């Protein structure tokens, strides 16, 4: 929490630590080798952490409910694998389903009043699916419903 400098490491834009745009590590950070590689290593991989964050920002910007909405945690639909919540803004609602597990999981969100999958994030070729109120979530995926 307060003392976690390794969690605040900057993006490796290059494998050359003296390249333009490279940041110094935060004070107190050890000599941690980042396992995801540099921008050059990640830019062409659609499932890289770089592209995941880029897509996350794009989705947030596309849906005001995500950026500015009020949050309701759907505890009855959440468990040790899935986190489900709704966000509402100006009369519009989205449902966000996060699978934080390395295993696939399903969620029945038919009672939340949404009918369409409008965005997703995935960390592999396996994509989330939504049909008849059931979200099928591969490992480490996110599904946005509206």
Question: Where are the regions that the model predicts?
Answer:
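Beta-strand-rich binding/interaction modules
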Residues: 104-124
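C-terminal beta-strand-rich structural cap/linker in extracellular carbohydrate-active enzymes
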Residues: 129-146
